[in-house]
A protein has these predicted regions:
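Cap/insert and terminal regions of metallo-dependent hydrolase folds
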Residues: 167-250
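Active-site metal-binding motif and surrounding structural segment of the metallo-beta-lactamase
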Residues: 38-89, 179
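P-loop/Walker A phosphate-binding loop and immediately adjacent motor/lid segment at beta-alpha junctions
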Residues: 72, 76-89, 143-147, 152-153, ...
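Active-site neighborhood of phospho(di)ester-bond hydrolases with catalytic His/Asp-centered motifs
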Residues: 32-36, 54-60, 93, 159-163, ...
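Conserved beta-strand hairpin/beta-sheet module of binuclear metal-dependent hydrolase folds
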Residues: 1-46, 147-163, 180
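Metallo-beta-lactamase
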Residues: 87-145, 247, 254
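Adenine-nucleotide cofactor-binding loop residues
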Residues: 36, 141, 166
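Divalent metal-coordination and catalytic microenvironments
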Residues: 3, 22, 34, 43, ...
């Protein structure tokens, strides 16, 4: 099981941090979670051919997390000398399929019916079981509909990704005893914004979930201010390992 942070930023363009995108590989199956602008290119940089993708997961519909969805569907449809036969399944929160239908009104009906099998699945509180991995989802507090994901490998490793969320018991429960918890940490404590986390709130979630490793991402500029708070405040609340995400950060579970 491998985790690669494809984009550690937010909706603000940055030369340092790409838009949100995360890749989990389980038994050679690449599973992307969110695909903000530039994610497809960063997948290629990470060694993943977009034609390998059979499952793509979204936490919510905000553009900094979804803007490469249409380019993916189009690329699989128009790549020369490539005729896809495998189904692509795209997962998102309640209403995600309706969101795509609205996009199709502007981009064209091909978005819903390309020349290969395509399915959109809305999730709420679900458990999806596959041969070598399981995905659990739970609603979190952000936009009208937002979900977090927990990926568990057959070998017992686990990663939880919050997407965008405020402090809520749902993310604590979903992340219980997880190996790696990826949480957004958008703003410093003194500039809390509804629907987002700060260093202290993120650390409290990590402590209550009893995760082993907390990775903080989705920082808004100026990054240095939030990073300073993470380094000074989070260790006082959460005793486990704490990392600040950066693009192409990679973790590997060996066994």
């Amino acid at each position: 099981m491998e985790l690669t942070i494809l984009g550690s930023g937010c909706g603000i363009p940055s030369l340092e941090k790409g838009a949100p995108g995360h890749l989990i590989v389980v038994d050679n199956e690449p599973l992307p979670f969110d695909s903000g602008s530039g994610t497809l290119r960063r997948l290629l940089t990470a060694g993943i051919d977009y034609k390998q993708l059979n499952h793509v997961f979204y936490t919510h519909t905000h553009s900094d997390h979804t803007s490469d969805l249409i380019p993916l569907i189009q690329a699989l449809r128009t790549t020369p000398n490539y005729h896809r036969k495998d189904k692509l399944t795209v997962y998102g929160p309640d209403g995600f399929s309706d969101f795509v239908k609205l996009l199709a009104e502007g981009f064209g009906s091909w978005l819903l019916e390309p020349n290969y099998p395509l399915e959109f699945r809305d999730l709420n509180k679900n458990t999806l079981k596959f041969k070598n991995w399981t995905i659990k989802t739970s609603p979190v507090q952000h936009s009208r509909a937002a979900i977090a994901y927990r990926v568990e490998s057959k070998k017992g490793h686990s990663i939880c990704y919050s997407g965008d969320t405020d402090y809520c018991t749902e993310i604590i429960d979903l992340a219980k005893n997880v190996d790696v918890l990826i949480l957004e940490c958008s703003f410093p404590d003194n500039r809390k914004v509804m629907g987002h986390l700060t260093p202290s709130y993120a650390a409290e979630i990590a402590a209550r979930s009893e995760c082993k490793h907390l990775i903080l991402t989705h920082l808004y500029p100026p990054f240095e201010e939030i990073e300073a708070e993470i380094n000074s405040k989070c260790p006082k609340i959460f005793s486990g390992k704490i990392s600040i995400a950066h693009d192409f950060m990679k973790l590997t579970f060996e066994s």
